[in-house]
């Protein structure tokens, strides 16, 4: 299974969307600053994740979530979660 996920950085108010085959490992990489794009983030919170059966489906979904309408979907999801407790 491939997981498409979204994280939020509170100080910058930025949303990052990615995909991985090991969400725990990937979140640890983000938090340790081992991801080129997210190493500038200081308060990373996972707020959305969904699994896809294969890489191709996951990549299509990732592209959608990075689109304008996908970003709006994620903003709605972000407002529905309590970021004080991570998923």
Describe the role of every protein-language-model region.
Residues 1-35, 42-66, 71, 76-87:
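GIY-YIG nuclease catalytic motif and its immediate N-terminal context
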């Amino acid at each position: 299974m491939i997981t498409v996920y979204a994280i939020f950085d509170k100080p910058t108010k930025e949303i990052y969307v990615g995909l991985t085959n090991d969400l725990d490992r990937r979140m640890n990489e983000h938090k340790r600053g081992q991801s080129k794009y997210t190493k500038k983030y200081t308060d990373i919170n996972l707020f959305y994740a969904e699994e896809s059966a294969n890489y191709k489906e996951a990549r299509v979904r990732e592209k959608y979530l990075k689109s304008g309408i996908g970003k709006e979907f994620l903003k709605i999801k972000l407002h529905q979660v309590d970021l004080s407790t991570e998923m």
